[in-house]
């Protein structure tokens, strides 16, 4: 290796970063310095994220008009992509950005069923290039092996061009995890209420971890994901976390605090005169009350207790980084939600004892939240065309993998409602995420795969002008 070659400089940088990473005191000092600097620009960051978010929203009505792609196919593709992200150890923001790219492309172009996995992996590839370290970005050979030789390498490059042109090269979009970090920092640095700020600061790690888990779960359910923006999903996830983990903070006060941020003079000073990005509130109190009802809590228990297989691998693996903590948080959240739905009956003697204890400790109970039994929305997974599974041993290996699965295999159409029609929670009992078998779709013979690869690249994508 030459002393002045780029590889030599890269090795020096890697060695220095490893030395810094092993110094906990240095890391703590850098984090405190970073936090102090970020606090000065939090309002500018909030305004920027909300402005960009309004311009990068997908359209549910257009996605539902896809002739071959059904909403029931979407969770299966996302489950496959999340597993890829976990195995490759990519950043947390890669998954929501990938989902945003997929949905925005499906809002502008017609996608054939056999190209849905190609779209997902190419969107993941684009997200990696924007958010992850260079050495973590998968190569074209890696992508080909991940999809078990279903597509040629040239197809990924071709699909990348189509995505970038269709989205007019607007790749970056605010993700819910960015809003969760910003919301937490805004609350911790809140100078008007030091008591709440200290409570949130003590539990900030648990709040961020569980809020991100809930946000990732919501990505798999179109009726939650499309009914709310990333900023609202992040706020809903934080409110659910505060409620289920029994953090002593009033939810309505917390909601009013975040809605009040967009009305402050510091926030409005970032808005140009005559600009269209005028924000009244992030999530209205009426929307909050209509969402947090018995039906939502009942299905939230099912969602939290039965995550997709990819999230089980990410959060609940035996030797996982957060497996013990996540199991505790999920157990606490489930028990809290069950208590909200079915309160434990108490005797008059027990009630008088509790009241006596509350008076001794000057405890002021939170006023009960009104429960509205009307509706809101989740679409469960249906059995439809599923992405190809892969083995981690196939990635970064020298041996060529054997073609085994093609994404375009014909399967029964997924269950979906007509465009624009609301889906309900009731159908979640019939189909659950964990019951989808993905490894069962195989080619009848190798000639089918050869014919799919010998197609003309110029006619692969039906681009509607």
Curated annotation (Swiss-Prot):
Source species, domain of life: Eukaryota
SUPFAM superfamilies the record matches: Cyclin-like (SSF47954)
Keywords noted in UniProt: Cell cycle, Cell division, Cyclin
Coiled coil: none
Gene3D superfamilies assigned: Cyclin-like
InterPro entries in the record: Cyclin, Cyclin-like_dom, Cyclin-like_sf, Cyclin_CLN, Cyclin_N, Cyclins_cyclin-box
Alphabetical GO biological process terms: cell division; filamentous growth; regulation of G1/S transition of mitotic cell cycle
Function as written in the Swiss-Prot or TrEMBL entry: Essential for the control of the cell cycle at the G1/S (start) transition. Interacts with the CDC28 protein kinase to form MPF.
Protein name per UniProt: G1/S-specific cyclin CLN2
């Amino acid at each position: 290796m030459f002393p002045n070659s780029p590889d030599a400089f890269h090795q020096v940088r890697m060695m220095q970063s490893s030395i810094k990473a092993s110094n906990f005191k240095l890391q703590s000092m850098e984090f405190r310095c970073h936090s102090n600097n970020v606090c000065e620009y939090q309002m500018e960051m909030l305004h920027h994220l909300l402005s960009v978010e309004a311009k990068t929203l997908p359209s549910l009505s257009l996605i539902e008009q896809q002739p071959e792609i059904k909403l029931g196919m979407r969770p299966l593709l996302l489950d496959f992509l999340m597993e890829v992200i976990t195995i490759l150890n990519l950043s947390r923001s890669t998954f929501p950005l990938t989902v945003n790219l997929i949905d925005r492309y499906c809002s502008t172009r017609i996608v054939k069923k056999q190209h849905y996995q190609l779209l997902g992996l190419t969107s993941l590839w684009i997200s990696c290039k924007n958010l992850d370290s260079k050495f973590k970005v998968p190569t074209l050979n890696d992508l080909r092996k991940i999809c078990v030789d279903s597509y040629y390498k040239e197809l990924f490059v071709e699909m990348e061009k189509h995505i970038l042109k269709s989205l007019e090269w607007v790749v970056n979009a605010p993700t819910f995890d960015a809003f969760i970090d910003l919301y937490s920092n805004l609350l911790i640095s809140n100078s008007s209420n030091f008591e709440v700020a200290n409570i949130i600061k003590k539990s900030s790690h648990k709040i961020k971890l569980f809020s991100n888990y809930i946000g990732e779960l919501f990505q798999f359910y179109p009726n939650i994901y499309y009914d709310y923006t990333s900023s609202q999903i992040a706020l809903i996830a934080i409110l659910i976390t505060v409620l289920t983990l029994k953090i002593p903070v009033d939810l309505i006060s917390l909601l009013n605090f975040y809605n009040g941020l967009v009305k402050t003079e510091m926030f409005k000073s970032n808005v140009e005169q005559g600009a269209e990005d005028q924000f009244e509130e992030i999530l209205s109190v009426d929307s909050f009350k209509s969402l947090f009802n018995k039906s939502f809590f009942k299905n939230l228990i099912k969602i939290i207790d039965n995550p997709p297989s990819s999230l089980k691998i990410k959060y609940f693996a035996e030797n996982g980084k957060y497996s013990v903590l996540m199991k505790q948080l999920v157990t606490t959240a489930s028990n809290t939600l069950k208590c909200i739905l079915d309160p434990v009956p108490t005797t008059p003697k027990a009630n008088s004892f509790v009241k006596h204890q509350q008076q001794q400790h000057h405890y002021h109970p939170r006023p009960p939240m009104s429960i509205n039994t009307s509706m809101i929305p989740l679409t469960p997974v249906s059995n439809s065309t599923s992405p190809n599974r892969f083995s981690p041993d196939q990635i970064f290996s020298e041996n060529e993998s054997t073609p085994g699965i093609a994404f375009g295999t014909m399967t029964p159409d997924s269950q979906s409602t007509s465009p624009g029609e609301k889906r309900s929670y009731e159908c979640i009992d019939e189909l659950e995420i964990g019951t989808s078998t993905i490894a069962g779709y195989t080619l009848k013979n190798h000639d089918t795969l050869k014919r799919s690869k010998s197609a003309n690249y110029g006619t692969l994508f039906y681009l509607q002008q």
